[in-house]
A protein has these predicted regions:
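Active-site-adjacent loop and "lid" segments of alpha/beta metabolic enzymes
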Residues: 1-14, 33-51, 55-63, 68-71, ...
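Catalytic domains of carbohydrate-active enzymes, especially glycoside hydrolases
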Residues: 13-29
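Phosphate/pyrophosphate-binding loops at sites that engage ATP/ADP/AMP, CoA/4′-phosphopantetheine
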Residues: 19-24, 146-161
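Active-site metal-binding loops of divalent metal-dependent hydrolases
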Residues: 23, 168, 240
């Protein structure tokens, strides 16, 4: 929820509500990766997420995911009870991540992304420049996701543990983000479940004429319905109840007999 909940009890209450509203997974992150956000060091990130994970595994009955690109955070999060490592770096941002993923036995989400030169910026998410240049966006994302898949499989991660994420909003222009969303189902030919995270992102705001993040709820629900129509397996959202209901109706309409 973008850091909206700071107190541990508030976080647990929010997570319980999300589960009641229909969430199948709770994703915990200690560093914002939205454009313009500043990198958090490992110790600070651990201090933010480990108490939350330890509490949540006792309080909710769905898997906990750790959203991190740092191997040490991933390792300790799994030790604390996380069952999924959700890496915005696709196991490429930290050289130790593939081994940590393999040894953990956790499910892994490999997101397409391109790492900026951190000697030139203190933000992990590129939104302009050469990192956002592509010929065919789907072909390139497919190829670069395959690199991530090969990395973790070489370390020992098995196919049944891998989930892929096209990385909407990461190292892509608005136009490329929209094209990638339109064609996201083409990535199924890699043979893995797809996680799509577009909730309240800039591309949604752009399609709504430039609306700010507080006015993107309906657009997000439309994107969720589109994801259902494309047989996307996992959708990451902020507003669980509304999106779960929208997805249920969309799925029913597609399969109603």
């Amino acid at each position: 929820d973008g850091g909206s909940y700071q107190n541990l009890e508030e976080i647990v209450a929010r997570a319980k509500q999300m589960v009641e509203d229909g969430a199948d997974i709770i994703d915990v992150g200690g560093e914002s990766t939205r454009p313009g956000s500043v990198i958090v060091d490992v110790e600070e990130e651990l201090a933010r997420v480990i108490p939350v994970i330890k509490k949540l595994v006792k309080e909710v009955n769905v898997p906990i995911s750790i959203d991190t690109y740092k191997a040490e955070v991933a390792r300790k999060a799994v030790e604390a009870g996380a069952m999924i490592i959700n890496d915005i770096g696709g196991a490429k941002f930290d050289p130790l991540m593939p081994e940590v993923m393999a040894k953990s036995g956790a499910y892994v989400v490999l997101m397409h992304n391109r790492k900026p030169d951190l000697t030139q910026t203190d933000c992990i998410t590129a939104t302009s420049g050469e990192l956002t240049e592509y010929d065919d966006i789907v072909d390139t994302v497919r190829e670069e996701l395959k690199e991530s898949i090969d990395l973790v499989k070489a370390a020992g991660v098995t196919d049944d543990k891998i989930i892929i994420d096209p990385g909407i909003g990461f190292a892509k222009t608005v136009d490329k983000n929209i094209e990638l969303m339109q064609r996201v189902s083409e990535l199924h030919d890699l043979g893995y479940p797809i996680l799509l995270g577009v909730s309240k992102k800039g591309s949604i705001g752009y399609l709504l004429g430039g609306l700010d993040v507080s006015n993107r709820a309906e657009g997000t629900m439309a994107a969720t319905c589109f994801a259902v129509s494309q047989e996307i397996e996992i959708v990451r959202v902020h507003d669980v109840l509304e999106n779960a209901r929208a997805a249920k109706v969309m799925e029913s309409l597609l399969n109603y007999v």
